[in-house]
Amino acid sequence: TRTRVKTPRGDYDGTIRTVVDLITQLSDGAPSQPTVGVDMPGIIDPRTRTVKNSNATWIQGHTFQEDLEKALGRAVRVANDGNCFTIAEARDGAAAGAAVVFGATLGTGCGGGVVVNGVCLNGCNGIAGEWGHSPLPWADKTVRQGRPCFCGQKDCLEQYLSGGGLARTYRDIAGRKVKAKEISGLLAENDADAVRAIEIYEDRLARALAAIVNILDPDVIVLGGGVSNVERLYDNVPGLIGKYAFSDRFETPVVKAVHGDAGGVRGAAWLWSENEVDA
C-alpha cells in the first residue's frame, strides 16, 4: 500500500503526529505488527541523537527518532533519505550486485549515499555521502558566486544541482522564472535557453561526480530525484566526467534509478535487514 500526505511544514509536533497517523493507518489490517523504517532529510547525530543537516529546518535539533518511538510505542529505524535511496538501488535496483555504489539524489535538495558490499556507510560524524554541501569543484565563470545555502555556506552543490538550482540557472539565462519540472518540456521544444541551462547543468554535475570518482571510484553511480528524469544526462554526463576525473579513462556506469521516487521508502524498509547500516 502506498499513501502520500502533506508534511506540516514548520510544525515539529504536527510532523510527528502526521507520521504516527500514517504508520497507524498503514498498519491496520496487517497480520502482524510491521517494522517501521523512516527516511528523512538530514541525519541523526551519532553523539547527541538530535537531527542535524536537514533542509526541513523545523526538525533540526530535535530527537526525532526517540520522539517518534515514544509516540508509537515501538522501535523505529531512521536514516538519511540519500542513504535510503542508495540502499534500495544497491539491494535490488539499478546497482544490484555492485560492490561500491554511490547514489545521488537530484531533486528538492542534493543528497547522496555510499553502499559498500551491501552496507550503507554513515561515517564517524554521520555525514558519509553528503556531497551536496561541498563547493562546486573546478568552478568557472559560469558560476555566479554567492548562492546562499540553508547550511550557512554559499555555492554548495545543492544550489546548482538540485531542481531549484537548475531553475535558477535557467532564470539567470532567460531572465524569467520557471519550475524545474517545466524545463523538460522546454527542452522537448528545443528552447534555446533551456538547452543552454541543461548544458551548464551537465558540466557542473560532471565536475561534482568526478570529485566523487577521484575519492571513491564507485562501480556504479545511480541518479535519482526529479532532475534525474532528464534523459539526456545519461548520454552526456559520463563523457564529461572523463574530462575531470584523475584517470586516462572513465568507464563507471552512470544510471537512472529503477525505483523512482519510491527508492527512499524502499531503502527505509531495508533498514531492518541485518547488517544493512554501518551505524
For each predicted feature, which ranges?
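ATP-binding/phosphotransfer module of carbohydrate and carboxylate kinases, centering on a glycine-rich
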Residues: 1-35, 44-48, 66-76, 89-98, ...
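Residue-level structural signal for beta-strand termini and adjacent loop
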Residues: 4-5, 56-57, 126-127
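Conserved NAD(P)H cofactor-binding loop of Rossmann-fold oxidoreductase domains
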Residues: 41
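A charged helix-plus-loop insertion that forms the helical arch/lid used to bind
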Residues: 49-61
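Glycine/small-residue-rich loop that forms an oxyanion/phosphate-binding "nest" at active or ligand-binding sites
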Residues: 77-83, 87-89, 103
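Active-site glycine-centered loops adjacent to acidic/histidine catalytic or metal-binding residues
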Residues: 81, 107, 268
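Glycine-rich phosphate-binding loop of actin/hexokinase-like ATP-binding domains
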Residues: 96-158
